[in-house]
């Protein structure tokens, strides 16, 4: 398990840095970001992605079903002298927020969603008429698409592609490295809710969401602050090959609209 998974303030600061340097400029190519822009993050965690938007004067709202993360978000924003609204709830129960947001952020959340079709059908209800969704997720087949980096075992947390083993063999491996029940359940849950580039684009079309842009990364921008690795976009010559590209896409950026 990496230090950032235990030190949530460190994780908050790292997310804010990555957002400021990479997510925000990408979003600004598709929607103006200015004071009073309404920004929602679904699955906001500690709120690191929202800090750069708050610093620009945007009205930011973070929603997460984990109340402990919302508590941390409020605390970290207060520490930074930033303003934001944070709510511990299922976003789709907050009907008073429909048709309100200019920008919706969904970063590294979609791969955890069980009913993805329902999620995409409903997320657009929260967009303003000219609003956009910034969606990012790791392709399932990429080396660490199973989130094995959360494991306490230093060996297992650094083993690429092990999540692609047959489920029974994968469970045996997790047990062999002494991971606890909580870790096992989380890893198998991620396996069950996995997402590929091809399935995401199919579901987006089904939900009548327009894909305005796609950017696939060989080296995830967040790896810069995490590991000191320079981000590297996937060449278009590889990005056009269905299924093969999934094995190399450490992060997939999308801009969606109604």
Predicted feature descriptions by range:
Residues 1-99, 103, 107, 247-254:
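Conserved N-terminal segment of class I S-adenosyl-L-methionine
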Residues 37, 130-131:
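Surface-exposed loop/turn positions
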Residues 51, 72, 115-116, 144-146:
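Short glycine-/acidic-enriched loop or helix-start segments at secondary-structure transitions
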Residues 51-54, 120-124:
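A structural alpha-helix within SAM-dependent methyltransferase catalytic domains
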Residues 98, 116-117:
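Conserved strand-to-helix beginnings and helix N-cap segments that scaffold or border functional pockets
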Residues 108-112:
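Short catalytic micro-motifs in class I SAM-dependent methyltransferases
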Residues 113-114, 127-128:
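Helix-to-beta-strand junctions that scaffold the AdoMet/dcAdoMet cofactor pocket
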Residues 117-122, 132-257:
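S-adenosyl-L-methionine-dependent methyltransferase catalytic module, highlighting the catalytic core
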């Amino acid at each position: 398990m990496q230090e950032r998974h235990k030190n949530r303030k460190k994780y908050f600061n790292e997310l804010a840095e990555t957002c400021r340097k990479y997510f925000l400029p990408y979003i600004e190519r598709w929607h103006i970001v200015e004071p009073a822009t309404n920004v929602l993050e679904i699955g906001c965690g500690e709120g690191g992605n929202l800090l750069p938007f708050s610093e620009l004067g945007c009205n930011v709202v973070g929603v997460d079903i984990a109340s402990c993360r919302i508590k941390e978000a409020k605390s970290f924003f207060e520490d930074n002298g930033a303003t934001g609204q944070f709510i511990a709830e299922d976003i789709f129960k907050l009907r008073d927020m429909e048709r309100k947001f200019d920008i919706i952020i969904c970063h590294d959340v979609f791969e955890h969603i069980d009913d993805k079709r329902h999620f995409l059908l409903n997320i657009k209800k929260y967009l303003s008429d000219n609003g956009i969704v910034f969606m990012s997720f790791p392709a399932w087949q990429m080396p660490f698409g199973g989130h094995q980096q959360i494991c306490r075992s230093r060996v297992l947390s650094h083993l690429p592609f092990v999540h692609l083993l047959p489920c029974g063999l994968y469970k045996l491996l997790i047990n062999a490295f002494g991971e606890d029940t909580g870790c096992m359940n989380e890893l198998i849950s991620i396996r069950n809710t996995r997402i590929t580039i091809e399935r995401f684009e199919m579901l987006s079309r089904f939900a009548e969401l327009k894909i305005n842009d796609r950017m696939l990364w060989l080296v995830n921008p967040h790896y810069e602050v995490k590991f000191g690795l320079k981000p590297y976009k996937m060449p278009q010559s590889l990005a056009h090959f269905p299924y093969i590209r999934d094995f190399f896409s450490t992060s997939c950026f999308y801009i969606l609209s109604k």
